[in-house]
Amino acid sequence: MANLTEKSFVRGRLIPILGALIVFIISFSVLYMGENVGLSDNGDFRRVLIMNNIEYKDDTNHYYLFNENYKMLLDNSDSFSGAIVSSWQTNDEEEIYKSPHFMFIKLSKTLNVIANKISGNALSDYNIMYLAILYIFMLSVAAGVIFTFFNESSVKIQITIFLLFIFIFCDAGYLLYFNSFYGEPLQYTALMMLIAFGMLIYKRPSVPKAIGFFTALYFFAGSKLANIPYSLIVALLSVIIVFMRKDRLYRVGIIITAGLCVINIISLYTEIPEWMNRDTTYQAVFLGITKNSKTVEKDLEELGVSKEYAPLAGTHAYMEKDEYPIDITTEEFEKGFYEKVKKTDIAFFYLKHPIRLVGELCHAIENSAYIRPPVVGNSETVPMEFTKKFSGWSKIRVSLRFLYEPWVIFVSFILITLYMIFMNVFYIHNHKIESPARKYMVCALDILILGLWINLVMPIVCNGEADLAKHMFLFTNCVDILFAIGITALVVCPIKRTLAIMCAGALFTGLFYIDLPRKTVTLGRLNGEPLEWEKIRTLEDGTELLVTKECVGFMPYDDESNAWEISDVREWLNTDFLSEFSVADRELIVMTKNRNLLAFNQRERAEGGNHAHYWNFTKSLVYDMGDTAYYNYTEDMVFMPNLMSVKDISVEEDFWVMSPYTANDYMARYMNDDGFILHTDVRNEKGVRAMIRIKR
């Protein structure tokens, strides 16, 4: 009997606790072992820092480097007790917005004050590590609860759950958010706590567990205010918890807890600041509905807006004032646009134009490939550098292209949704004979499937294509959860069926890597070896566009500028690179007039265009609106792929793209080895793929 009790303790308590401890250690190590890593500021930190009385320690550029150290603005930084009290103060002079997220930031401030007192540092010093520790602790607790839920399952299932949690949900793509002031880390950890409490309720329902569940739901809703509609649906569907037990006291407790949760979530909605609603509405219309529309004026009239605002199509809410073709700060625009267009109008517009909605959703799905936001950096020292620490799942999910292939996602979601509709009809029809636990399980799956659809549609309807990759984080998270459920179900299957499904999955994945052989040409020499080129296409004048099959060198783009016309890489390609070409080879090369995009700071050199090119990292959208962006021309014998030609080029390793990152004048675009087009400092080394145009 004693041995049985000891085994029960080990499986029921000790192993889950050890699992949670491993999650904590791994998470902390990913962020702080070796170089400290996190996420740089994309501009969103400002409002969080202001509201919580925190500021940067210096005036250096923080947009592309992860920053660990800040300064707290404390009313009484000389007194320990006064500093503790001041750490919980909110900036009442700046009513930017309110969020439950601030509670965690204030708690991290208190931890910093205590640590500073112990270490002898200035009480006002702020290290974001303490905020990360809070998130790591929440993730570890959620992991421990999830491991506990499976403590009575087979060893095979327990090992599978543990490995999936470590490999997928402790991936750097998720953990990097912990070292930032974004709302996503609270969203992520609150979602994991929500799942954990949901599992506890499934096993042994009680009011305290329900309180934990609905508290996690409240923080999930408040972490990103766009989560509020989904959170309300979750709260209403979670009424199924009431029927898990029959005693009246339990049911009353659940109803009261759920009611308080709904009231608090609704209060979050009522406190959404008007500026946030205005900006997102602007972007949903002008960087969403009308962005690539061929009927802009008709679209605006359908929304109840004057067609005079048609020139604003393709603009966003955070441009310089002189970049707008129409002044959007006037009272006339306030009445003519902001007072007329609501989010419901945008939703109904898409319902009446489902083909256009599907098109936008396809772009959204493609933007869900990365877990970490591809527009911000991870390093403290190298601008726009991505860490490779513990990024196995990030790498694999990009390689598994079906996870962000639009038609695969749509077909899968539709089939799963139809199956869940069938299951709901079945359980409703047989509600008298089915157990509450099984109904609860079906309801939990309903919540997940609804989350997939809602979090696919919400970013487009509520904010257009603005910052789309980052706004797809919750959708990506839900897809990963569904994938983990699928892998777990696969492990449960009989071995023969498991092997058959794995073989079919491998074959299906392989279909995405089928690439027809390209015609190759041998021309010129480099380092004494003949150069092999791939034919891209034949142009209208009969000349052929070629690109080197492999990188011909690895070097910085330039030592300071992202302008192609004055770059070091352009000079090298048109001098040293050609030095081993024979006269006959050179005579085959045709001088090419290239249209080059320009950074915003270089617009005075533009020969055309009326805006800086907007950033995107997918092949389908990377050149979007490039035809109207600032540009000039150069003539080159040898050049590099640009944003228009990258979609036709094979990818084996990173290589520079002949286009700047237009938000500044010291970063350039490059093709990552996974087929996405990113950006980095021009002083970093990347591969070079030469392009030429030759006579046939």
Task: Enumerate the predicted regions with their spans.
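Hydrophobic transmembrane helix bundles of membrane-integrated enzymes that assemble
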Residues: 2-35, 101-290, 401-495
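Transmembrane signal-anchor helices characteristic of membrane glycosylation enzymes that use polyprenol
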Residues: 12-77, 260-271, 509-510
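Membrane-proximal stem/loop segments at transmembrane-domain junctions that anchor or position
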Residues: 49-93, 273-383
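Extracellular-facing segments of soluble proteins and assemblies that are Gly/Ser/Thr-biased and enriched
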Residues: 108-141, 364-392, 575-614
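Short linear, low-complexity motifs centered on an aromatic residue
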Residues: 362-379, 487-497, 552-555
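Small-residue-rich helix-loop
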Residues: 377-398, 404-412, 440
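Sec-dependent N-terminal signal peptides of Gram-positive bacterial secreted proteins and lipoproteins
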Residues: 502-510
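Collagenous Gly-X-Y triple-helix signature in extracellular proteins
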Residues: 514-696
